Amino acid sequence: TARQLIASVGGTVTPYGVVYDNGMRLEQVYDGQFFPCYYYEPHATMVAVTPKSEPENTEHITWLYLPMAQEEIDRVLQRSGIADSADARLRLEHSQLPDEVNALLDMEHESLADLNALAQATNNFSTDDIKKLGAAVTLAKPQNAEQVKNLAENLDLFDFAPDAHSQAEYGKYMIQQSGHYEFDENLDEFYDYEGYAQQRINDEDGMFTDRGYIAYKGYFSLEEIMEGGQGGSMEMGGMV
């Protein structure tokens, strides 16, 4: 504490006050070419970029905080000596994306352009949106960042009941919380939650996931949506 420092260390009197040596040693971390890693945007997708011509454990790391303008990416890479993004090795260091997405990204085959587009598509996602995207990924099984981006841009084509892991929980969510019905708690014991959910499940393209129940309500197939097909829905609205 300040009192302990004053009591144990002799200070140097200056015209501006008394200066005490607290033992802190400053270290230069910027070498004039590669900036150190630092978190300045909580929702940024952080990608470590190194030249393929150098060992994987090289200390010459360029940090990108996606999404970024393409001109900015090009400028940062050029400053680091990488003239072509194809010559760059990528590593995902941090992201706000759900674990389901992080697990499927193969950084050896992903491009900076696709990762940047995905970061842009999810940049303003809320916590609920992130959970819904994780469930949608489990249902649709995309293979790369571009397909995940296309799912993210069409999340309104999915109905999502968060934390519903059984037919009864799904039915209860629909009747009590979805806003589709006027729920009367005095009649709670008379609702057939499980039966109602079973009827919906039979008519839907959905599944239970670790995050809840999710169903796809679009007109085009999931494969077409993930390949960038025109989004469209046969039903208006959704639960989430």
Feature locations, PLM:
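Mixed-charge (acidic/basic) macromolecular-recognition segments
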Residues: T1-M46, E59, P67-E185, E189, ...
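A short beta-strand micro-motif
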Residues: T45-P55
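Short, solvent-exposed secondary-structure boundary motifs
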Residues: E56, Y196-A197
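Extended, charge-rich alpha-helical segments
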Residues: S166, A197-Q199
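Non-Sec secretion/translocation targeting segments of pathogen effectors
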Residues: D192, E227-V240
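Disulfide-rich extracellular domains of secreted proteins
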Residues: Q198, M207-G229
